[in-house]
Every structure is written in structure tokens, then in C-alpha cells.
Amino acid sequence: MAFRIIETCIGCTACVKRCPTDAIIGDRKGLHIIFSELCIDCGACGPVCPVDAILDQYGNVQRMLKKNERPIAFVYEQACTGCEKCVERCPFEALEMVPVKDPSSFLGIVRVIEKNCTGCRECEKACPYDAIFIYRKDTVPDWLKDSKVEKAA
């Protein structure tokens, strides 16, 4: 999917500030451009545009999604080793480490801070253990829902 900015852009730079990969450039008060090679299709830019100037590949305005429509990260806790690669890669500080009761898991596991997650897939790409996936809440597979590990108090 490729997003684009149309001529109604007022150059407020809100999208530039929100883009985790610096894929958007432009002068203040001028038309901005999205570099498709850098864009990760996270959709973080659209909801902050005050003039609805960011369109998706179908020409639809990229607006704020309802909470249940928004894709977010889900951790497959049995596969998470606590390596923190996803935490380090997340541009929105949407992941944190939490301890677990199992003493063999001294590193802990990753927890998603849902309010910060945009579903940009950077964590999913960074995980070498296939322990993190991006889904809408209403489409999460049962095997992932049932993968909870007992966390330390």
C-alpha cells in the first residue's frame, strides 16, 4: 500500500513529526511528499492531518481508525525470549519488558502498550523468533490469544 499527500496539504508538518521512518518531507507551509521506499504503511500520518490531505492507495482519506479496527502488536509469549530487539526497534515506545514467574526466563517478556501502538510492523520485522504479530483485535487467532505466560507480581 502506498500513501500520498494531495494539494490540499497546508504544510503543518504534523505528519512529518508522526512518521517513524522519516518518509515524509516538505517545507513548512508547503506541499509535503511521502517517499514510498521509506514508507512502512503504518498509517500514523493520516490521523494527525488536520485537512485530510493524506490518501491511501485507493484514494480514500487516511483517517483515524476506530479502536477495534486498528492493527496492533500481539506477543506470542511462549516464543518470546526477552531479547528486546522489538523494544529497541519500536519508534513509538509501544513495547516494554515485564518479568515472568518462570525463573528460566530471567530476561522477561515483551508487553504491548496498546495506546502507543500504531501497528507499523517494525517490531514484527525485528523479532528473530517470530514472537510478535500484527493483527486487528477482532482477527487475532485463538492460538495467539491462548499463549499467555504467567507474569511476576
What residue spans do the PLM features occupy?
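Flanking helices and flexible, charged tails adjoining ferredoxin-like Fe-S electron-transfer domains
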Residues: 1-8, 16-17, 37-153
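Glycine-rich phosphate/oxyanion-binding loops and their immediately adjacent helices
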Residues: 26
